[in-house]
Structures are given as C-alpha cells and as structure tokens.
Amino acid sequence: MPLYEGLGSGGEKTAVVIDLGEAFTKCGFAGETGPRCIIPSVIKRAGMPKPVRVVQYNINTEELYSYLKEFIHILYFRHLLVNPRDRRVVIIESVLCPSHFRETLTRVLFKYFEVPSVLLAPSHLMALLTLGINSAMVLDCGYRESLVLPIYEGIPVLNCWGALPLGGKALHKELETQLLEQCTVDTSVAKEQSLPSVMGSVPEGVLEDIKARTCFVSDLKRGLKIQAAKFNIDGNNERPSPPPNVDYPLDGEKILHILGSIRDSVVEILFEQDNEEQSVATLILDSLIQCPIDTRKQLAENLVVIGGTSMLPGFLHRLLAEIRYLVEKPKYKKALGTKTFRIHTPPAKANCVAWLGGAIFGALQDILGSRSVSKEYYNQTGRIPDWCSLNNPPLEMMFDVGKTQPPLMKRAFSTEK
C-alpha cells in the first residue's frame, strides 16, 4: 500500500486490478509496477482429491458463483488485505469471455463484496497501454488457447480475430503423453522402472514445473527437422541430435529421467500445421489478411505477444522466423503487401503485460470513473455492458447514477465548446 494512503490522504483509494487467468491469477493495485501476487486460479474443496479450477465455462451458475466467491475472498483477505468496499475494481478479461462467466463474476463483486464500481477491460487492449501505441497485432498465448486480435487506433477489430486451442494445456497434454511413453523412474525399490508402473498420470503442477524448467523452443531450421522426423513415413529423415537428458526429482524419493528429445519436441505442437494448415504463426498472418488493406503494414510492424506460454525460451525468435518463412509461400505472398514484421518488447514479463496495462488505466482516476459500471447502476438494472449485445444502455447512463460526471467525461461526450 502506498505510504500516502497510510498517512490518511483524503483522495480516492487506488483501484484493485485483477487478471483472472485460467491457470494463474495476477492481482495487485493500480499505479504499481507489478502485481502483489501471482497464484494458481484454483481453490481446495473438502472431499475433492484435486484442487478445483475457478475459471470454468461449462458449469452451472450457482456452482461458478460459489467458486468465484471463495477465490476472490482469498485474494482480498489473504493477499491484498484491503476492504473491497473502499476500492474500485479493474478486471482484465478476454474478448471471448462468455457472458455467463462475466455476469456471474460481476454479481459476486457487486452483491457479495459490494465494490463501488467494476471496469471490464480487454486484455489485448490493455497490453498496448504499456507501450504507448495505438495500433498493434496482439497475440495472447495463454493456458487454454492462443488468441490473436488486431487493435487499430485503440479500437479492437473484432471481425478479424483468430484462435486455436494451442497453449499451456496442449503442451501439458503432449508432455504427459511423451513422459509416460518414453521415460523411466528410479525408486528406492528398483532402477529404471517405466513411469506408468510408478504413477498412472503426472500431476498438473509437475507438468507445469517440468515445462518451465526444462523445455525450450528450437530455431526454425532445427524445428523443421524435428517435425520431418516425427512425421517420417519413408524413414529417410533423421532427427537432429537431442539436448542433454535431465534428472527431475519426484516426491523427494524418486528420480525421473527426462529424455533430451522430449525437451525440444514438446513445444513443436505450437508450430506444426494441422490438417487445415493452421499454427500459432498462421494465426497472425490469417488475421492480417482479414484486416483492411491500408492497416496491414502498420499492424505487421507492431506485433505484441503476451501470455505465459510465450515466455518459453526461444518462443519469440521462432515465431518471427516462422512468420518470415510462411510469408514467402504462395498462400500469403500475394495476399500480403508487406514482408516487414517486428515484435515489441513490453516493459514487463509476458504473463503480466495485460495486468500492467490495467494498472496504468486504473491509475487514471477521471477516466476510470467515466468508464466503470457503478454499483448504483448495477443495483438498478442488474446488467453490465457487453460488446456482443445490441441492447446496451447509453454510455452516460452506466456511470454513477445521480452524480455529476467527471470533467473528462463531460469533455468527451458534450457538444458544448
């Protein structure tokens, strides 16, 4: 908490910024350079053998309400240690977040925690605030999927988005498959036992740790050779020499022998083109083709990559090499008028870029007040604005019912000179 708040400043208290990701949640205060905590988006329930994921889209409303209520209570009273009634809230969300989830989340915040206001901010748009630019092609490589969305002059171009189920979850599934098929374990009983005979499945936390500590992305030339050897039908393609094997401790009593070939081949699923010739790299190019032709050059020269999966060593270098390799193919060579692609380096780790953008936005008190949904409006209507809904109320009705609008709000929406 900033010092001036502790000295009894009469100004409005800084907002709480929450980036509720499917794997990890980032939480902190507006105006700060980093989140106060990064914790798994799970809760532990009595009688359940495994932790329960909080971000779920296919469960009923009351169950989701219960999960979110318990998780946000942990955020406020175990990590942030502040009164939720005193501070506005900025929620960083995906543009593809289902209405069912966001409505349940806002109901928890307004009805249970009684927060003064809530702002739902798109993660792709918030990422640009950290760079001070208005236009970019933003790729978010998260846990469930990779989602690309062009932003032009501060406006998301919603009809040009693209997504693929290629993210941390897909990497974990591939990693577990290869570990169970190829790896051995040393125990106190015997050496080099097959992994399935020791444990039927690998816990999610262990997969995450192995991925972060041992896996990396090969360069383009090596990656193409690995893919050719993997799909080798006639037996002519040889795999490049693998990196060193790694011994990974399990439970303090077992040693898992991870083959070097697994360390670099797991991540190739992000760049292997499927039956429809789609990969993480083609997502960007396909989205670029859908954009208006006069915006493509500017978007191609301003690529922004966020999300925890993109933090793998070598990911950005490989992504740029893949794009430059694919753009020479007939499918894209004629359609795209530019061959220049550049990736920005945001002033934060890739998994915290969207949170930092929300912290910057939340520190602008006048703008935050003019863009947030107030508690009074929500109590009157029970609704929140949704970009995919055609019957949203007028903008000026959503903010601080019965109160005068902030000066910036007046300037933005008034016709007076």
UniProtKB/Swiss-Prot annotation:
Q: Which gene encodes it?
A: ACTR10
Q: GO cellular component terms?
A: axon cytoplasm; azurophil granule lumen; cytosol; dynactin complex; extracellular region; ficolin-1-rich granule lumen
Q: Which family does it belong to?
A: Belongs to the actin family.
Organism from which the protein derives: Homo sapiens
Cited Gene3D superfamilies: 3.30.420.40, Actin, Chain A, domain 4
| Localization per record | Cytoplasm, Cytoskeleton
Describe the function of this protein: Part of the dynactin complex that activates the molecular motor dynein for ultra-processive transport along microtubules.
The record ties this protein, via InterPro entries, to: Actin (IPR004000), ATPase_NBD (IPR043129)
What are the record keywords, sorted? Answer: Cytoplasm, Cytoskeleton
What's an example Gene Ontology biological process for this entry? retrograde axonal transport of mitochondrion
Give the domain of life: Eukaryota
Against SUPFAM superfamilies, the record matches this protein to: Actin-like ATPase domain
Tell me, how does this one assemble?
Subunit of dynactin, a multiprotein complex part of a tripartite complex with dynein and a adapter, such as BICDL1, BICD2 or HOOK3. The dynactin complex is built around ACTR1A/ACTB filament and consists of an actin-related filament composed of a shoulder domain, a pointed end and a barbed end. Its length is defined by its flexible shoulder domain. The soulder is composed of 2 DCTN1 subunits, 4 DCTN2 and 2 DCTN3. The 4 DCNT2 (via N-terminus) bind the ACTR1A filament and act as molecular rulers to determine the length. The pointed end is important for binding dynein-dynactin cargo adapters.
**Which protein are we looking at?**
Actin-related protein 10
> Which CDD domains does the UniProt record give?
ASKHA_NBD_Arp10
